[in-house]
Every structure is written in structure tokens, then in C-alpha cells.
Amino acid sequence: MTKRTFGGTSRKRKRVSGFRVRMRNHTGRRVIRSRRKRGRARLAV
């Protein structure tokens, strides 16, 4: 069986797809809006 190779880095994840990064531009705000509309518990990472 193969190993799980994805480690995941908290800082990188926040910088790429955190809430404040999403709010910076129009498309990011659209993502937040659509997730709010859908009723997601977590809007961003």
C-alpha cells in the first residue's frame, strides 16, 4: 500500500485560501458569498 505523501502546511494554506485573502479581490468575495448562500459552516480555511 502506498504512503500518504500530502503533509499540509498551515501557513501556506492560510496564505492561499484564508478568509482575508479571499476578501482581497472580486472573485474571492464571490467565493465567500456563494459559500454563505449555501450555508457552509466554514467559509474559508
UniProtKB/Swiss-Prot annotation:
One of its GO terms (cellular component) is ribosome. One of its GO terms (biological process) is translation. The keyword Ribonucleoprotein applies. The keyword Cell membrane does not apply. Keywords: Ribonucleoprotein, Ribosomal protein. It comes from the Bacteria. GO terms for molecular function: structural constituent of ribosome. InterPro entries: Ribosomal_bL34, Ribosomal_bL34_CS. PROSITE patterns: RIBOSOMAL_L34. NCBIfam families: rpmH_bact. Belongs to the bacterial ribosomal protein bL34 family. This is Large ribosomal subunit protein bL34. It comes from Prochlorococcus marinus (strain MIT 9313).
